[in-house]
Amino acid sequence: MKKKGIFGGTFDPIHNGHLHIAYEALYKLNLDRVIFIPSGNPPHKTDKVITDANIRYKLVKDVIQNEEKFEVSDYELKNQGLSYTYKTLKHFNEKHKDTEWYFITGADCLMQLDSWKNINEVLSLCNFVVFRRSGYSMEDMLKQKERIEKKFNKKIIFLDIPVIDISSTTIRNKIKNRENISYLVPEKARCMVNKMNLYK
């Protein structure tokens, strides 16, 4: 049985924090691969302006192209309508029946888990993995983890890694203000952002 991670997000743009999380998940969970899945039309961000999905996909693809154990999927980009996690997990479970899936997400999603569509199905289709994010205390995170585990009778895996205080929002604002982002994003992403004149 293979073990693969699904790392979903808007990746607008992908940054060094995303890569750090993916590497940590890969080795701490002993995964065979980590699949980055840029969201097509995330239901929790319908009121926000998001960069074209194909551009976000290309950013991720270019950044990870030489990483043997990373890949990117355009599954959510090809599907019309809102990008629900249960649909994505169902697709990958049906397509790869020899694989045990680990869904990797942040503390912010853990705090909103009750509002997710078909959350019972989500938790039954994967091992749900949560990493810390800035702005969320360890105490609050562990309380929510325990509450969710009791409510849905499912185990949540806590990925114990240092908090990387980088956000795509901060990066977009820095670009808009003509500030240096070279220490926040991979070189390939930075070059593509400049070439396409993104986030200005």
UniProtKB/Swiss-Prot annotation:
A Pfam family of this chain: CTP_transf_like
Keyword Mitochondrion: no
Similarity comment text for this entry: Belongs to the NadD family.
Protein name per its UniProtKB record: Probable nicotinate-nucleotide adenylyltransferase
Pathway info: Cofactor biosynthesis; NAD(+) biosynthesis; deamido-NAD(+) from nicotinate D-ribonucleotide: step 1/1
Catalytic activity, as annotated: nicotinate beta-D-ribonucleotide + ATP + H(+) = deamido-NAD(+) + diphosphate
EC number from the UniProt entry: 2.7.7.18
A GO term, aspect molecular function: ATP binding
InterPro entries with a match to the protein in the record: Cyt_trans-like, NadD/NMNAT, Rossmann-like_a/b/a_fold
Organism superkingdom: Bacteria
Gene3D superfamilies from the UniProt entry: HUPs
